[in-house]
């Protein structure tokens, strides 16, 4: 049980302390409740670009990374469809440096054309390297646009295309920052060797002077219920054929989500999994098979995927059928309580070992705070899952009319 202390500043910033005296270090994590889903459909990639711009300096801090490094620290960030996260790790006795730097860019980010052009080039190159030059690099683009027809999850975090990034202006960036990067839309968490009293005192000193301001309302178009199967074939620079079957499902923290998480573990996690025992040894066409879920706050997806040793269309069709049959079997041949217990224990071990690291804890606690979860009880919803629930949720999700099939074939030209 982790002793988590909390307070909220007058401007709405939630401040969380996780005191750990076993280390000489500390992590300062700032999580903003904004992500790619808050972009316009013709200006995608903006949230990720702004993440980069947050390191370009603020009014009183010209060199964010340089000042942090001089205090013995490092920093980084990530953007998802739902959130944007910034973190710094440094010796606990220098913790105030991180507070000063984070507060200054929350209050007064330096918007200028030079930094925008520099980071635009960096992000555009990142797009090319990750999405255009890597085998299966554009899988997320194709799969999201196949599964989501109206919801903003239909584009990836990096953006639909480089052209969107190219036309983002300084005014667009400034407006997005003003709409979303407010203290009341963020969580500040400190994990490590900094007592709660000092965390709250420093938060008051450096963040309380940032004025509260309203954030832009969120009004996403709801994804309609899928009533017919969809498919897409891509001929690309890939080493082998891949097949992905994606099924729409409910978002994070719903009962369906927790059960689906266990379903994918039973299907593909480890040598005792259904895919490993029933697909890989008996069928040499499968090079690998996997099952996973997209843990988004709003609509998610359950994915069944495989890489194949045979590049023929017939092999792809056969693999898709076998993936579907094996997953559907959970609805007709109930799993055992022992299988569920093993899956829950694996998940609990993963959570426990992951939280041994103070940086991982800082990020996880920040996320659970924004999601209004009890961090110390995150495993509890899984403990009551039954074989009957697994069968029921399998029937709800794995349905022929909800299939979204994406097949990659190696280019032959």
List each language-model region with its residue ranges.
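Charge-rich, well-structured scaffold segments of protease-associated domains
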Residues: 2-4, 8, 66-215, 222, ...
């Amino acid at each position: 049980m982790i002793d988590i202390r909390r307070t909220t500043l007058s401007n709405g910033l939630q401040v969380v302390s996780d005191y750990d005296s076993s280390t000489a270090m500390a992590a300062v994590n700032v999580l903003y409740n904004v992500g790619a889903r808050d972009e316009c459909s013709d200006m995608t990639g903006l949230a990720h670009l702004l993440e980069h711009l947050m390191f370009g300096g603020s009014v009183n801090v010209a060199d964010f990374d340089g000042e942090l490094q001089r205090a013995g620290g490092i920093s980084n960030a990530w953007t998802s469809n739902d959130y944007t996260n910034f973190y710094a790790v440094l010796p606990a006795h220098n913790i105030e440096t991180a507070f000063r730097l984070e507060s200054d860019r929350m209050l007064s980010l330096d918007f200028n054309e030079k930094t925008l052009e520099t980071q635009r080039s960096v992000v555009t190159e990142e797009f090319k390297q990750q999405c255009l030059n890597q085998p299966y690099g554009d899988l997320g683009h194709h799969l999201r646009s196949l599964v989501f027809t109206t919801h903003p999850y239909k584009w990836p975090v990096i953006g639909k295309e480089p052209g969107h990034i190219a036309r983002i202006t300084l005014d667009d960036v400034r407006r997005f920052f003003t709409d979303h990067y407010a203290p009341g839309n963020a969580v500040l968490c400190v994990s490590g060797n900094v007592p709660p009293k000092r965390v709250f005192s420093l938060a008051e000193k450096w963040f309380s002077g940032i004025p509260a301001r309203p954030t832009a309302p969120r009004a996403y178009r709801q994804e309609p219920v899928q009533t017919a199967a969809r498919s897409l074939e891509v001929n690309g620079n890939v080493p082998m054929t891949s097949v992905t079957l994606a099924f729409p499902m409910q978002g994070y923290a719903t009962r369906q989500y927790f059960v689906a998480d266990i379903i994918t573990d039973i299907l593909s996690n480890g040598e005792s999994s259904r895919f490993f025992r029933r697909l890989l040894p008996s069928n040499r066409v499968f090079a690998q098979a996997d099952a996973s879920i997209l843990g988004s706050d709003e609509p998610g997806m359950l994915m069944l995927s495989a890489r194949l040793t045979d590049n023929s269309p017939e092999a792809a069709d056969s693999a898709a059928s076998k993936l579907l049959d094996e997953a559907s079997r959970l609805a007709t041949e109930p799993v055992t309580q022992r299988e569920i217990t093993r899956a829950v224990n694996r998940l609990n071990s993963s959570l426990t070992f992951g939280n041994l690291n103070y940086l991982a804890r800082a990020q996880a606690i920040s996320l659970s705070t924004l999601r209004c979860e009890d961090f110390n009880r995150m495993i509890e919803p899984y403990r009551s899952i039954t074989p009957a629930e697994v069968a029921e949720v399998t029937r709800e999700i794995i349905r022929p009319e909800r299939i979204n099939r994406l097949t990659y074939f190696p280019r032959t030209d």
